């Protein structure tokens, strides 16, 4: 049911010409769950990823997976990469966060930035002086797309649980009481209406 809703959601986003959608299908913390919970879910994800290229072709949407894919089973990673390679370009973008943790993303970005600076010959205070928010942002998993404007959290939870910690600094949040499989078109429309009625200040 949740995967069917995922396909529907892509259609809803397409109707409103939303250029970037990021969906969190599996957190890094989820990976600590027992195999009898994870294995069936992995199978569902593989089935979804097999369908994704067709869906994304219909909506002219590029696919990119973000997260610690090295922690995931080989067959799941293979299905993800096949989907990504099948539709790498498009006027819209679908990010799928899998094995994802917001803190880990920031750590990975910091490591990548420092490694890049060292390779360029920087060290000591000179290296430190090169580290700033713009430089770090350029090394986030989805650095090539804008930060999100709206984050929709389902399941009645009022927390981010580590989702897009860096990118969501100025995003607007909408918390929805229903679980994801029960998320309806009307819930989506209400979230957009709520967002449209807000006055965004971007921290000012």
Language-model segment annotations:
Residues 1-204:
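Flexible, compositionally biased loop and terminal segments
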């Amino acid at each position: 049911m949740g995967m069917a809703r995922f396909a529907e959601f892509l259609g809803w986003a397409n109707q409103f010409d939303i250029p970037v959608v990021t969906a969190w299908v599996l957190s890094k913390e989820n990976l600590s769950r027992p195999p009898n919970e994870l294995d069936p879910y992995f199978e569902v994800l593989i089935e979804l990823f097999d369908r994704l290229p067709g869906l994304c072709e219909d909506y002219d949407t590029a696919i990119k997976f973000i997260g610690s894919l090295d922690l995931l089973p080989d067959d799941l990673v293979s299905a993800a990469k096949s989907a990504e390679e099948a539709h790498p370009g498009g006027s819209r973008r679908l990010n799928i966060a899998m094995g994802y943790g917001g803190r880990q993303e920031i750590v990975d970005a910091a490591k990548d930035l420092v490694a890049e600076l060292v390779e360029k010959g920087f060290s000591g205070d000179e290296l430190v002086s090169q580290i700033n928010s713009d430089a770090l942002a350029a090394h986030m998993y989805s650095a090539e797309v804008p930060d999100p404007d709206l984050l929709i959290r389902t399941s009645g939870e009022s927390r981010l649980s580590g989702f897009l910690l860096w990118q969501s600094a100025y995003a607007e949040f909408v918390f929805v009481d229903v679980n994801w499989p029960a998320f309806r078109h009307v819930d989506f429309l209400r979230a957009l209406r709520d967002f449209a009625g807000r006055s965004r200040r971007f921290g000012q």
